[in-house]
Regions:
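N-terminal loops that bind phosphate or other acidic moieties
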Residues: 1-133, 137-380
Length: 380
């Protein structure tokens, strides 16, 4: 019997690797001779680098980059085991958590550090970059990123503009003569689970600006600046990105990756499961187990359990979900490939207690599921 264990992390509690390990422990108590394949998974957001590195026997590369406020910060990216693919999280270099709440101002914050991460990855000779762009602190249209990669964003006098979304209204022309030539030889895939355009009522500034510290006045200024930026890109690069779905992701980073890197914007879970070769792994499985911190009606929107289930159902495999908690509307997940779902919580308790006992609760839940499966085999 082959059992594939492919969970996401339980946010603020357990990594995907730890969840998978505890599920295996529980099942081994009942099925000691089964073949277990543990495959930590992520949806393109937090934890993606660690999950992809673990699954490909790769490594983490620690680097110093320019933070959102222009200071020097510690960041990281991942390399696959064959060192042909880089795994990058924008949040590691240009994330909201890098900026204290009282200093959040998207007129000033820059994505320059994300460009430095990409440049470091190219220095390692990668042929493929997978970039997660969630959790950003910026609204600069990815301008900082492309500046780090060699593009010159020039004002009317021919001087380079500064950092931050507030500088984009000064942009007069774009010179890509010194843009890193290695970009053309690298395939860029962007984990992007939003479809917002660059500008407008559903654009980057209006929808995501407030969480980055933007006031109503800033939102209007930033939206106008991004519109101007898009017009210069259209004129100088002959590329229209303003209303492309996903262009507004991460404060317009989606637009920059499209225009300057020729990136493909895709659902994060699709990129991850494809890169991990999940199809081939589950093809001959007897059972697939997945999970995340909470399984609810939102799980069907690009989350790991449904992404894993969709792959498994291509081969008619049974799928079980194990979650920290379930909600009353969880039934909808059964229509999307999860055959059964279980919570690891056995009684009403505080969040602190639930987090403290998470590992043992996952193991015990997995053991009970395995025992139930074994009983059912005997009954049949």
């Amino acid at each position: 019997m082959k059992i594939v264990i492919a969970p996401d992390s339980y946010k603020e509690s357990m990594s995907a690797q730890d969840v998978a390990a505890q599920i295996e422990k529980g099942f081994r108590d009942v099925f000691p001779d089964a073949c277990y394949v543990k495959l930590p998974v992520a949806d393109g957001g937090e934890g993606t680098v660690e999950a992809m590195v673990a699954a490909t026997n790769g490594r983490i590369v620690n680097v110093k980059v320019t933070g959102p406020l222009g200071d020097n910060i510690a960041a990281f990216f991942g390399l696959s085991g064959d060192e042909k693919t880089a795994f990058i999280e924008m949040a590691a270099a240009s994330g909201l958590e890098q900026v204290p709440a009282q200093q959040r101002n998207p007129l000033l914050t820059t994505s320059y550090g994300t460009g430095e991460l990409i440049r470091c990855a190219l220095d390692h000779g990668v042929e493929h970059c997978i970039i997660g762009i969630g959790g950003s602190a910026t609204n600069d249209g990815g301008a900082g990123m492309v500046q780090a990669l060699g593009a010159k964003l020039l004002d009317a006098s021919g001087a380079q503009i500064g950092f931050g979304g507030g500088e984009l209204d000064k942009l007069a022309s774009i010179d890509i003569g010194e843009l890193d030539a290695r970009i053309k030889k690298c395939r860029f895939e962007v984990a992007c689970d939003v479809t917002n355009p660059l500008t407008g009522e559903q654009g980057a500034s209006a929808i995501f600006g407030p969480q980055k510290g933007a006031t109503d006045q800033m939102i209007e200024q930033l939206d106008n600046a991004l519109g101007h930026y898009a017009e210069v890109i259209r004129h100088d690069l002959d590329t229209d990105v303003e209303q492309v779905p996903g262009a507004g992701a991460a404060g317009g980073m989606g637009a920059a990756l499209l225009a300057f890197c020729g990136a493909d914007l895709r659902q994060g879970i699709e990129i991850v499961t494809e890169a991990l070769g999940l199809d081939e792994i589950v093809r001959d499985a007897s059972l697939v187990i997945t999970g995340e911190g909470r399984i609810d009606s939102q799980t069907i929107h690009g989350k790991v359990p449904i992404g894993v289930a969709r792959v498994a159902k291509r081969y008619d495999k049974p799928v079980i979900g194990i979650a920290g908690s379930l909600t009353a509307d969880v039934g909808v997940v059964h229509e999307h490939g999860l055959d059964a779902v279980f919570s690891v919580l056995y009684h009403i308790c505080s969040l602190e207690e639930a987090l403290d006992n998470a590992a043992e609760n996952v193991r015990m839940t997995a053991r009970n599921i395995a025992a139930t499966i074994k009983l059912s085999q005997g009954l049949s």
